[in-house]
Amino acid sequence: MALTLDIVTPEKRVLSVQVDEVRAPGVQGGFGVRLNHEPFMTALEPGRLTYVEGGREHHYAVGGGFLQVADNRVIVLADTAEAAGEIDVDRARKAFEDAQNRLLQLTEQDESHSAESARVRRAAARLTVAGR
C-alpha cells in the first residue's frame, strides 16, 4: 500500500502518483508524510517538495499553497509547481535577480514589499530545486 500524491496548480493537475513518502516546506518548518499519517492541513512556503517513489527521490519547486493529508492521500494545492528537470535555470536566475533588485528598492512599509519578498522566495526555490 502507498500514499497517493496529487499536485494541482490553478492551471492544471501537475502530478498524480503513488509514493512512499512526501517531504514539504510548511510555513512552520519542513515536514514529512508517510503511510497512515494523521489527517492535517497546512500552508506551504515556497520551497522544495520531495517525494519518494520506489526508493527514488523526485523534486518539485512549489511556490507556496496548501497541503492536506487524509486517508493515505496527500493533496497539494500549489500556486506554482515545477519538476526539477523542467526548470529553465537562466529564466529562474533572471527572475530571482529582478525580484531581488525590486525588493532592495522597497522598505518594509511599502505595499508591494510582501509580494516582492514572496517572488524572491519562489525564484530562490526554483534555483535550489534545479540544483543551481
From Swiss-Prot:
<keyword id="KW-0813">Transport</keyword>
<keyword id="KW-0375">Hydrogen ion transport</keyword>
<protein>
    <recommendedName>
        <fullName>ATP synthase epsilon chain</fullName>
    </recommendedName>
</protein>
<keyword id="KW-0472">Membrane</keyword>
<keyword id="KW-0997">Cell inner membrane</keyword>
<dbReference type="InterPro" id="IPR020546">
    <property type="entry name" value="ATP_synth_F1_dsu/esu_N"/>
</dbReference>
<comment type="subunit">
    <text>F-type ATPases have 2 components, CF(1) - the catalytic core - and CF(0) - the membrane proton channel. CF(1) has five subunits: alpha(3), beta(3), gamma(1), delta(1), epsilon(1). CF(0) has three main subunits: a, b and c.</text>
</comment>
<keyword id="KW-0406">Ion transport</keyword>
<dbReference type="GO" id="GO:0005524">
    <property type="term" value="F:ATP binding"/>
</dbReference>
<dbReference type="InterPro" id="IPR001469">
    <property type="entry name" value="ATP_synth_F1_dsu/esu"/>
</dbReference>
<dbReference type="GO" id="GO:0005886">
    <property type="term" value="C:plasma membrane"/>
</dbReference>
<dbReference type="Pfam" id="PF02823">
    <property type="entry name" value="ATP-synt_DE_N"/>
</dbReference>
<comment type="similarity">
    <text>Belongs to the ATPase epsilon chain family.</text>
</comment>
<comment type="function">
    <text>Produces ATP from ADP in the presence of a proton gradient across the membrane.</text>
</comment>
<dbReference type="InterPro" id="IPR036771">
    <property type="entry name" value="ATPsynth_dsu/esu_N"/>
</dbReference>
<keyword id="KW-1003">Cell membrane</keyword>
<dbReference type="InterPro" id="IPR020547">
    <property type="entry name" value="ATP_synth_F1_esu_C"/>
</dbReference>
<keyword id="KW-0066">ATP synthesis</keyword>
<dbReference type="GO" id="GO:0045259">
    <property type="term" value="C:proton-transporting ATP synthase complex"/>
</dbReference>
<keyword id="KW-0139">CF(1)</keyword>
<dbReference type="Pfam" id="PF00401">
    <property type="entry name" value="ATP-synt_DE"/>
</dbReference>
<dbReference type="GO" id="GO:0046933">
    <property type="term" value="F:proton-transporting ATP synthase activity, rotational mechanism"/>
</dbReference>
